[in-house]
Curated annotation (Swiss-Prot):
This is Myotubularin-related protein DDB_G0290005. The active site is at residue 575. It is found in: Cytoplasm. Residues 865-882 have a biased composition (Basic residues).
Length: 1324
C-alpha cells in the first residue's frame, strides 16, 4: 500500500487535470525516493539483489526496487494502474496475446497471462498519438472436458430443463473459476465467502423465468472482465480509482490503492465514440476499445481494452500522460529516478566532457604550436554575454573582451563567431555563429572575423621545402545554410555579410531545409510507414523528401571538407539562429575529419560540445515544454502533425481536451533525428571507421524522449544548471560509458589503427611542389590528400538509403522474455546493465569447469614436477591451489624430487663407461684444470658460480708439502649456496664412506627441503649438478691412481735402462693421454663447444706434470679411495629403490581415494538430476491440469475498412489446439444473432420479474450489492418457473442439431462475418 503523506514541494493546478495527476505521481515518488513502494494486495514484491561492484565488496543496505510478476522495475518507479483482459494485437504475425497492461509513472508494459512473458514496453515520453480503430472483438471460451467440483450443487430444480440450463451454468461456473484462478495469482489473499455467494447466485439463477438467459449471460460477461466478487474487489483495489482522474480534482494526497469496492461511470463522450466497437463473449455483445498507439520513435502497437471502468480509466490515463506540457520539472520521471550509488560511485556522465581538455587535444590551447593564436575566455561564466552559449569558448588571442561584447550585439541571440575545431595538419579552423541582425556595419564583428581568417594555416609552396604559414593568401569561406523559404519577404542574401567590408572572404549559399520543411517531411514519412506496403512503400519514401535532405547534408559536408583538408582554408558556418542546421553541419564535418569523434567517447564529446553546450533546443524541438518557462494556450485545431501537441488535439475530439504550448506545434522538428540518421549513413558507407554500432545510435534516440535521463532536458546549458539537473538527474553518458564494452554497442569491423589520435599536433611536410589554389585540378587535390591523409572521410551523397531497422522497427518487435532484468533492459535500451547503471557480465555456469578446475589443481603438482627438468633452471612455475591441498602437493613434490635424484645418480653411475650419454637440457659451462708443481699432493675443489653461465673449475695443484682439503667458494649467495652445501656433503663421503653418513645426507636433504619449501623445484636442478660434480671427483681419483701406477713402473725401469728412459716416458705419456680421453668424453655431455679448447690445454699440462712426477714416490692411499667410491654408490642405489617403491604405493592409494570420491560425487549428481526431473515432471503435470481447467479462448478481431471488399483472415492457436485467433477486415459490422435480439426484447418485457439484474446486452460494471441481492430476487420468481421450463423443453430439439454444427465450426480456420442462427442457439 502506498503511504498517504502530504508533501509541500508539489504545486497543484485546479484548472489542469494532468497537473494533479503528475503532481501526485511526483509526490509519491518523492516519498518513495529512499524507499521502494510495496504493493501487497495486487501483486507480490520480491527482493532483487543487484550485482555488486566487485565480488569482494559487501552487500550494501539499499531499498530494493519493486517487482511485478518477477520483473524488476526501475528505482523510483511504481505502478499506477492495472488493466486485466487486454489483447495485444500483432501487426505482422498472428501471435495475438491476452494479458495484463500495467501503467507506471515511467512506462506501460504488457505481460502475457499464459506464458508470463514481457511482450512490449512503451515509455510515457514516447507517446505521440492514440487513435481509435473501428471494429469489434469476439472472445469465445470452449467448454472444459473435466467437470468442476463447484458445480455439484447446481441441481436445485426438480424440472426437466437439465439439457439447457445446466449446460449454461456449467459454462458460467467454469469461466468464473478459471478466471478467478488467473486473477488470484496477482493477489496474496483469497476471499472464499464472496466466491460462495457468487456460486450460490449462479445456482439459484435457474429458477428465474424470462430473465434467465440474460442473467446467465450477464454473469458470463462478468466472468471475462469481472469474474467473481473476490477478484473484482481486488481489481477495484488496484484499478477502480487509484488516482482521481477527474479534471476538478484538487486534493494533495498521494495516490493510494483504495480498499473499498467503489465504482465509477464512464464519460458520455467516450461511450458515444465507442458504440460501434463491440466485444462478443459467447454470443453476448460487449464493447471494446481498439487502440493504435503511435510513438515518437516510429513504433506502432495495438491494444484492445475492455469497454468497462478499468478500460476507460486506462484510456484516460494514456491521454493524460501523452500531454507533454509539464507544470514543474519535478513531474518528469528523470527527477524521480534514483539509482543507488553506494560507497563506490560509477562514472559520472555530467563530468565526462571537459572543454579545456578537448581544446587542448585539438591544439588550440596549451600547445606551443598554437597557444599564441587562441585563448580560452571566461567572459560568459554567468551566461550574461550569451544565454545559449557555454561558459568557456575559444576566440582569437588578439580580440579583447570589449570587442567581443560589441560583436555579440550584431548577431541574432548574441551568438557571435566562435572557433570549435582545428584541423590537425592544415591548422584550418571551423567556426560557427548566427546571422547578422541587419545591414548596418559593425567594425568589431569585422575585426573578429578577420582575426579568425588570419590564423596560421599550412599551405604547400612552390619549392620542395618545408611549408610555412601563409596569412596573406588565406581566404575564409562563410557557409550560409539558411533556406530560401526562411525569409519570404526578403531575398536570400539579406542579413548576410557584405563582402566589401570583409576582405578576402567568400560567401557560399547552401540552402538546407528549415525546421518546418523537416517536420512536413517527417509527417509524410510516418504516413508511409504506418500504411506500409512492400510493393509501393519504397517508392513512396522517395516522395517524402527525407532521403533528399540527407543527401543534401552530405553534399555540403563534403564541400566543407575540401576547404579544410584539401585546400587548407578556414570556414564559418551560420544560419538564422545557429542552433539547428549549424549544429548538424558542424558535427558532421568534425565527424568526417577527426577520427577521435568516431569512437564512443569521442562521439559523446561531439554531442556534448556542438549540441548541448552551444544551445540546441532539445525540449522545444521534441515537443515538450514546462509551464514555468513558457506560456500555455489551448490548441483546438488538429492538423494531423507528427507532434505531441497534434496528437493531443486529435485525441481531444474523441476523449478529453488537453493543453499545449503555442510553440510546441510550430517549433517541433526532428533536427537531431536527422543528424543521427546521417551518422548511420556514414557507418554504412565506411563500416570499418566507426567504433559504435547501429544499436548505439538507437539507444541515444530512444532516450531522446524517454525522460529517463536529464541529458536532453531543457534548451540550453544555462537552464540545466539553473534547474540543478547535474545533481538531481542522471546523465545518459553514464549509461553508455558503463555499457561501452557491451558487444551490441560495438562495431566488430572497427579498425582501431585508423582512429588512433595523438594529443600533439604535427606540422605538415612538403610532399608536392604544386601549390593548391582555387584553380587546382582534382588530381592534384587527391595527390595532396593521399600524401597527407589522416583518416578523413569523404561521403557519397548519392549512397543514401532508409534506416529500416529504426523506421520500420514495428516489423521486428522485441522478443518476449521471462527474465527478471528484461523490463530494465527494455527501459534502458541496453542489456546486461542493472537499474543502478552498473554493467554486469552474463554468468556462465558449467559443471565441467568446476570439476576440471579441482582436478587440474590436484594433478598439476605431479605433472609439473615430472616435466620440470625439461625447462631451464631459472624458470619457475607457481601454481595456485587451495589451502587444503597445499601441504599434500608440497609433500608430493619433495618426495618425487628425492626419488628422481637417487634414480639419476644410479643411472649416471652405471653409464659412465659409455661414450654417448643422454642428459637433460641443462647448459653448464665447465672447465677442468689439473696442475702439479710439488712432490706433495693437495686436493682443492673450487666451485665458482656466475650468471648467466655456471662454470665449475677443479684444480689439482701441489704447492705445499702438507696435504690440505679445502671447501668450495661461492660468488653469488642466492642459488649457488645449495650447490656448495652439496659439495661439502660429497667431500664428507670421501672421508667417511659409511652407512651412517648416507643417512645423514638424507636427513640433511629433508631438512633443506623443509626449510626451503618455495625452492623445491630449484633443488631438483641443483641436485643434478651435485651428482655431476661427484662423478667428476670420482674420475679425477681414477686418473690419480693411474698416474701413481705409471710412476712405480718408471722407477723400476730407471735402474735397468737409464738410457732408454726418455723413449719409454714418451710412450707412456701417449698411453696416459689415451686413458685420459675416455673419462673426459664422459664429462663432455654437459659442456659447450667453448669448453673443448680448455680440455686440450689441460691435456698438455697433464703431460708436463707426468714428466715431473716420474721421480716422485707413489702414494699407497689410492686403493682406499677406490673402495670408498664403490660402497657409496651401492648404498645409494638400494636406498633410492626403496624410496621409489614407497612413493609409488602412496600415489596408488591416493589415486584410489580420488576415484572413490569422484564416484560418490557422480552418484550424488545423478540423484540430484533425477530429483530435478521428477520435480519438473510434477510441475508440468500440475500446469497441464491447470490448463485443462482454464477456458480456452478464440479471439476474432474485425477491423472495419470500407475500401476493402473481401475479408482477409489470419489464424493461429493461442492456448491450445482447439482455440484460435483470427483477425480480418470487412466492410460491414457483423450484426447480432436474431435470438439475441429476441432475448433483449424478452429482458425488456420482463423487467418486473428480473429485479435488480442488469438486462442490457452492453457490458457495464454491476455493483456487488446487486449480485448479492440476486438470491432475494430469485425467490420471488418461482411463479414463472413453469413457463421457463416449457420454453426450455421446446429448445431441447434444437440443441442436438446445433451441437453438430458447432463441432464442424471448430474445425474451420475462420469465422464468418455474421454469426449463423445455429451458432447462436448452441451458445444459448
Amino acid at each position: 500500500m502506498f503511504s498517504n503523506k502530504n508533501t509541500d514541494n508539489v504545486e497543484n493546478d485546479n484548472n489542469n487535470a494532468l497537473g494533479s495527476v503528475i503532481a501526485r505521481i511526483n509526490s509519491q515518488n518523492i516519498i518513495t525516493k529512499n524507499k521502494a513502494p510495496v504493493i501487497s494486495e495486487d501483486f507480490e514484491t520480491q527482493d532483487f539483489d543487484y550485482p555488486s561492484f566487485d565480488d569482494e565488496t559487501p552487500n550494501y543496505d539499499r531499498p530494493q526496487p519493486t517487482m511485478v510478476e518477477n520483473f524488476t522495475l526501475l528505482p523510483g518507479e511504481f505502478v499506477l494502474m492495472i488493466t486485466k483482459n487486454v489483447v495485444n494485437l500483432s501487426l505482422t504475425t498472428t501471435t495475438h496475446r491476452i494479458g495484463t497492461l500495467y501503467q507506471t509513472n515511467y512506462q506501460m508494459f504488457f505481460i502475457d497471462d499464459s506464458t508470463r512473458q514481457l511482450v512490449s514496453t512503451i515509455a510515457n515520453g514516447q507517446l505521440l498519438q492514440i487513435k481509435k480503430l473501428k471494429g469489434h472483438v469476439t472472445v469465445k471460451y470452449h467448454d472444459n472436458t473435466t467437470p468442476n467440483n463447484n458445480n455439484n450443487n447446481n441441481n436445485n430444480n426438480n424440472n426437466n430443463n437439465n439439457n439447457t440450463n445446466n449446460n449454461n451454468n456449467n459454462n458460467i461456473n467454469k469461466s468464473n473459476n478459471s478466471s478467478t484462478d488467473q486473477l488470484n495469482s496477482f493477489s496474496l489473499e483469497k476471499q472464499p465467502s464472496q466466491n460462495e455467494n457468487l456460486n450460490n447466485n449462479n445456482n439459484n439463477n435457474n429458477n428465474n423465468n424470462n430473465g434467465n438467459n440474460n442473467i446467465n449471460n450477464n454473469n458470463l460477461m462478468n466472468s471475462l472482465t469481472q469474474p467473481s466478487t473476490s477478484s473484482r474487489s481486488r481489481l477495484l483495489k488496484s484499478n477502480s480509482t487509484p488516482i482521481n482522474l477527474n479534471e476538478s480534482s484538487t486534493s494533495t494526497n498521494s495516490p493510494t490503492l483504495s480498499s473499498t469496492t467503489t465504482t465509477t461511470t464512464t464519460t458520455s463522450s467516450t461511450n458515444g465514440n465507442c458504440s460501434t466497437n463491440t466485444w462478443y463473449s459467447n454470443g453476448v455483445s460487449e464493447k471494446a476499445l481498439i487502440l493504435e498507439i503511435r510513438c515518437k520513435d516510429f513504433m506502432i502497437t495495438r491494444y484492445c481494452l475492455p469497454f468497462n471502468e478499468k478500460g476507460n480509466e486506462a484510456f484516460e490515463l494514456m491521454n493524460k500522460l501523452i500531454c507533454n506540457n509539464y507544470q514543474d520539472s519535478n513531474q518528469l520521471f528523470s527527477m524521480s529516478y534514483s539509482p543507488f550509488k553506494g560507497v563506490i560511485s560509477p562514472i559520472d556522465g555530467w563530468l565526462f566532457y571537459d572543454p579545456i581538455e578537448e581544446y587542448t587535444r585539438q591544439g588550440l590551447i596549451g600547445n606551443s604550436n598554437g597557444s599564441d593564436e587562441w585563448r580560452l575566455t571566461k567572459m560568459n561564466s554567468k551566461y550574461e554575454l550569451c544565454s545559449t552559449y557555454p561558459q568557456h569558448f575559444i576566440i582569437p588571442f588578439s580580440i579583447s573582451d570589449y570587442l567581443l561584447n560589441k560583436s555579440s550585439s550584431h548577431r541574432n541571440k548574441n551568438r557571435f563567431p566562435v572557433v570549435t575545431w582545428r584541423h590537425k595538419q592544415t591548422h584550418a579552423t571551423l567556426s560557427r555563429s548566427s546571422q547578422q541582425t541587419g545591414k548596418s556595419r559593425c567594425e568589431e564583428d569585422e575585426l573578429l572575423i578577420q582575426a579568425i581568417r588570419k590564423s596560421k594555416t599550412i599551405l604547400p609552396n612552390n619549392n620542395n621545402q618545408q611549408q610555412q604559414p601563409q596569412q596573406q593568401q588565406q581566404t575564409l569561406y562563410i557557409i550560409d545554410i539558411k533556406s530560401t523559404s526562411s525569409s519570404p519577404t526578403s531575398s536570400s542574401s539579406s542579413h548576410c555579410e557584405d563582402i566589401s567590408h570583409y576582405s578576402q572572404c567568400q560567401i557560399e549559399s547552401e540552402c538546407l531545409s528549415n525546421i518546418h520543411e523537416l517536420r512536413e517531411s517527417q509527417l509524410k514519412l510516418f504516413k508511409v510507414i504506418r500504411n506500409w506496403n512492400e510493393k509501393k512503400g519504397w517508392s513512396e519514401i522517395q516522395s517524402t523528401g527525407w532521403l533528399d535532405q540527407l543527401s543534401k547534408l552530405l553534399m555540403v559536408t563534403k564541400k566543407i571538407l575540401t576547404h579544410l583538408h584539401l585546400e587548407g582554408f578556414s570556414c564559418l558556418i551560420h544560419c538564422i539562429d545557429g542552433w539547428d542546421r549549424t549544429c548538424q553541419l558542424s558535427s558532421l564535418v568534425q565527424l568526417c575529419a577527426d577520427p577521435y569523434y568516431r569512437t564512443i567517447k569521442g562521439f559523446i564529446v561531439l554531442i556534448s560540445k556542438e549540441w548541448l553546450s552551444f544551445g540546441h533546443k532539445f525540449m522545444t524541438r521534441n515537443g515538450q515544454s514546462i509551464s514555468s518557462t513558457s506560456t500555455t494556450t489551448t490548441n483546438s485545431s488538429s492538423n494531423g502533425q507528427l507532434t505531441s501537441s497534434s496528437s493531443n488535439t486529435s485525441i481531444s475530439s474523441n476523449a478529453t481536451t488537453t493543453t499545449t504550448t503555442t510553440t510546441s506545434s510550430k517549433q517541433t522538428s526532428p533536427v537531431f533525428l536527422q543528424f543521427i540518421d546521417v551518422v548511420w549513413q556514414l557507418t554504412k558507407q565506411f563500416p570499418t571507421s566507426f567504433e559504435f554500432s547501429d544499436s548505439f545510435l538507437s539507444v541515444i534516440l530512444h532516450h531522446l524522449n524517454s525522460n529517463l535521463f536529464g541529458t536532453f532536458l531543457y534548451d540550453s546549458e544555462k537552464e540545466r544548471q539553473q534547474n540543478n539537473l547535474p545533481t538531481e538527474t542522471q546523465s545518459l553518458w553514464t549509461l553508455l560509458l558503463s555499457a561501452q564494452k557491451n558487444s551490441s554497442l560495438l562495431n566488430p569491423l572497427f579498425n582501431q589503427q585508423l582512429s588512433n589520435e595523438t594529443s600533439s599536433t604535427t606540422n605538415l611536410t612538403a610532399t608536392t611542389s604544386i601549390p593548391l589554389t582555387n584553380s587546382t585540378t582534382l588530381d592534384q587535390q587527391l595527390q595532396f590528400k593521399n600524401n597527407n591523409d589522416d583518416g578523413v572521410l569523404f561521403p557519397n551523397p548519392k549512397g543514401v538509403q532508409l534506416w529500416s531497422d529504426y523506421f520500420l522497427k514495428w516489423r521486428n518487435p522485441p522478443k518476449a522474455s521471462r527474465k527478471s532484468n528484461t523490463l530494465i533492459a527494455h527501459s534502458l535500451g541496453v542489456s546486461y546493465v542493472n537499474g543502478d547503471l552498473i554493467a554486469f557480465q552474463k554468468k556462465k555456469r558449467s559443471r565441467r569447469s568446476k570439476d576440471g578446475a579441482s582436478g587440474s589443481s590436484s594433478g598439476s603438482s605431479g605433472s609439473s614436477s615430472k616435466h620440470h627438468h625439461h625447462h631451464h633452471h631459472h624458470h619457475h612455475h607457481h601454481h595456485h591451489r587451495k589451502s587444503t591441498d597445499e601441504k599434500d602437493s608440497k609433500e608430493k613434490s619433495s618426495k618425487s624430487s628425492r626419488s628422481r635424484t637417487s634414480s639419476s645418480s644410479k643411472r649416471k653411475s652405471l653409464s659412465t663407461s659409455s661414450n654417448s650419454i643422454t642428459q637433460p637440457d641443462i647448459k653448464i659451462n665447465e672447465t677442468i684444470t689439473t696442475t702439479t708443481t710439488t712432490p706433495t699432493n693437495t686436493t682443492t675443489l673450487t666451485n665458482t658460480s656466475t650468471t648467466p653461465r655456471n662454470t665449475t673449475t677443479l684444480t689439482n695443484a701441489s704447492t705445499t708439502p702438507t696435504t690440505t682439503t679445502t671447501t668450495t667458494t661461492t660468488t653469488t649467495p642466492t642459488k649457488d649456496e645449495t650447490i656448495n652445501e652439496s659439495v661439502q656433503v660429497n667431500n664428507d663421503k670421501l672421508k667417511s664412506p659409511s652407512g651412517d653418513d648416507i643417512k645423514q645426507e638424507q636427513d640433511e636433504m629433508n631438512q633443506f627441503t623443509s626449510q626451503h619449501p618455495n625452492n623445491q623445484m630449484e633443488s631438483s636442478s641443483e641436485i643434478n649438478q651435485q651428482n655431476e660434480q661427484s662423478q667428476l671427483e670420482q674420475q679425477q681419483e681414477q686418473q690419480q691412481q693411474q698416474e701413481q701406477q705409471l710412476q712405480h713402473e718408471q722407477q723400476q725401469i730407471e735402474q735397468q735402462q737409464l738410457q732408454k728412459q726418455q723413449q719409454q716416458q714418451e710412450q707412456q705419456e701417449q698411453q696416459e693421454l689415451e686413458q685420459q680421453e675416455q673419462p673426459n668424453e664422459t664429462i663432455t655431455y654437459s659442456m659447450e663447444s667453448d669448453s673443448q679448447s680448455s680440455i686440450s690445454q689441460n691435456q698438455n699440462q697433464l703431460q708436463q706434470q707426468q714428466q715431473q712426477q716420474t721421480l716422485l714416490d707413489p702414494i699407497d692411499e689410492s686403493s682406499l679411495l677406490a673402495t670408498t667410491t664403490t660402497t657409496t654408490s651401492s648404498t645409494a642405489i638400494t636406498s633410492a629403490s626403496k624410496l621409489e617403491k614407497e612413493l609409488r604405493k602412496q600415489e596408488k592409494e591416493k589415486r584410489k581415494l580420488e576415484k572413490e570420491k569422484k564416484q560418490k560425487e557422480r552418484a550424488e549428481r545423478k540423484l540430484e538430476k533425477e530429483k530435478k526431473r521428477d520435480q519438473k515432471e510434477r510441475e508440468q503435470k500440475e500446469k497441464e491440469l491447470l490448463e485443462q481447467q482454464k477456458p480456452k479462448a478464440d479471439i476474432t478481431v474485425v477491423l472495419q475498412s470500407p475500401s476493402k471488399k473481401k475479408a482477409m483472415s489470419l489464424t493461429m492457436p493461442v492456448r491450445g489446439t482447439k482455440s484460435r485467433i483470427s483477425i480480418f477486415s470487412s466492410p460491414l459490422v457483423p450484426t447480432l444473432h436474431p435470438n439475441l435480439s429476441d432475448q433483449n426484447s424478452q429482458t425488456n418485457s420482463s423487467g418486473d420479474n428480473s429485479g435488480n439484474v442488469n438486462n442490457s446486452p452492453n457490458l457495464t460494471s454491476t455493483p456487488i450489492s446487486n449480485l448479492s441481492n440476486n438470491n432475494n430476487n430469485n425467490n420471488n420468481s418461482n411463479e414463472n418457473s413453469n413457463n421457463n421450463n416449457n420454453n426450455n423443453n421446446n429448445n431441447n430439439d434444437n440443441t442436438s442439431f446445433s451441437k453438430r454444427i458447432f463441432k464442424t465450426l471448430r474445425g474451420t480456420k475462420t469465422f464468418n462475418r455474421e454469426p449463423t442462427p445455429t451458432v447462436g442457439t448452441a451458445l444459448n
